[in-house]
């Protein structure tokens, strides 16, 4: 049995993670901690893998503390910048088990979203134009979503490798309506009551358009991906920092 501790256990995602861990045949809940709880309760004696689902403002400190405890961590919190990732890598290198420490960060745990992202990177080189639209519930704290940013980076890298010119755009004034530009790709965020988590990637050429869309209607859609990551970290996942569930899928 894989002993799993959950940080952010009383949050929207954390509650689902606790339930998923309790219901899976090969995992058992070790500790369920939330804001204000002492993370040093989590040790390698009582925990094999930690799942961290909190908020961007505290996630980095949580992960650094857990690395210091020598436990492997699955992170579902978004808002990770290059600077924050560099701090995680440094903490691993200087932590108690630099050769075996595993930290996994996923922009999205929904299999549909991971596949949509993968398909988008494959399609990117064939189209002159590309834009990303992400749609979420109005209580989401970050915009654009980490998934959308990750998708935009992947599209940009594929376009660069193919030698494509920048996407065409004659806009001179927009007042912010053209969204955030991520590596030359426009990313738009919608926050609307009734939505959960959705993403559309639009590709265009003269006379044609391709739309790739992923919809998560309920947070239970993320749990198979979370459990996959837990099992991989408890098993054959490589040491160090891994980003993206695609690394654990046969793509």
Swiss-Prot record:
The active site is at residues 136, 140. InterPro entries: DapB_C, DapB_N, DapB_N_CS, DHDPR_bac, NAD(P)-bd_dom_sf. It comes from the Bacteria. It catalyses: (S)-2,3,4,5-tetrahydrodipicolinate + NAD(+) + H2O = (2S,4S)-4-hydroxy-2,3,4,5-tetrahydrodipicolinate + NADH + H(+); (S)-2,3,4,5-tetrahydrodipicolinate + NADP(+) + H2O = (2S,4S)-4-hydroxy-2,3,4,5-tetrahydrodipicolinate + NADPH + H(+). One of its GO terms (molecular function) is NAD binding. (S)-2,3,4,5-tetrahydrodipicolinate binds at residues 137, 146-147. It is an enzyme of class 1 (oxidoreductase). GO terms for cellular component: cytosol. SUPFAM superfamilies: Glyceraldehyde-3-phosphate dehydrogenase-like, C-terminal domain, NAD(P)-binding Rossmann-fold domains. PROSITE patterns: DAPB. Its main location: cytoplasm. It is found in: Cytoplasm. Its EC number is 1.17.1.8. NAD(+) binds at residues 8-13, 76-78, 106-109. GO terms for biological process: diaminopimelate biosynthetic process; lysine biosynthetic process via diaminopimelate. Pathway: Amino-acid biosynthesis; L-lysine biosynthesis via DAP pathway; (S)-tetrahydrodipicolinate from L-aspartate: step 4/4. Keywords: Amino-acid biosynthesis, Cytoplasm, Diaminopimelate biosynthesis, Lysine biosynthesis, NAD, NADP, Oxidoreductase. Catalyzes the conversion of 4-hydroxy-tetrahydrodipicolinate (HTPA) to tetrahydrodipicolinate. Belongs to the DapB family. PANTHER family: 4-HYDROXY-TETRAHYDRODIPICOLINATE REDUCTASE 1, CHLOROPLASTIC-RELATED, DIHYDRODIPICOLINATE REDUCTASE. This is 4-hydroxy-tetrahydrodipicolinate reductase. It comes from Bifidobacterium longum (strain NCC 2705).
């Amino acid at each position: 049995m894989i002993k799993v501790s959950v940080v952010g256990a009383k949050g929207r995602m954390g509650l689902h993670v606790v339930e998923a861990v309790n219901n899976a045949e090969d995992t058992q809940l070790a500790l369920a901690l939330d804001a204000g709880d002492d993370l040093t309760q989590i040790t390698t004696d009582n925990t094999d893998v930690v799942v961290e689902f909190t908020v961007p403002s505290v996630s980095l400190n949580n992960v650094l503390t857990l690395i210091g405890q020598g436990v492997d961590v699955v992170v579902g919190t978004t808002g990770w910048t290059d600077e924050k990732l560099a701090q995680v890598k440094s903490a691993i290198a200087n932590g108690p088990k630099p050769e075996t420490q595993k930290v996994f960060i996923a922009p999205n745990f929904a299999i549909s979203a991971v596949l949509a992202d993968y398909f988008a990177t494959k399609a990117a080189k064939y189209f002159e134009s590309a834009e990303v639209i992400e749609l979420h519930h109005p209580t989401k704290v970050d915009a654009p979503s980490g998934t959308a940013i990750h998708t935009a980076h992947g599209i940009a890298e594929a376009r660069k490798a193919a030698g494509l010119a920048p996407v065409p755009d004659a806009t001179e004034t927009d007042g912010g309506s053209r969204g955030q530009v991520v590596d030359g790709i426009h990313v738009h965020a919608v926050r609307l009551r009734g939505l959960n988590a959705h993403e559309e990637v639009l590709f265009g050429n003269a006379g044609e358009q391709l739309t790739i869309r992923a919809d998560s209607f309920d947070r239970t859609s993320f749990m198979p991906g979370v459990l996959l990551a837990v099992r991989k970290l408890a098993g054959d996942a490589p040491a160090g920092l891994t980003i993206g569930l695609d690394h654990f899928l046969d793509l």
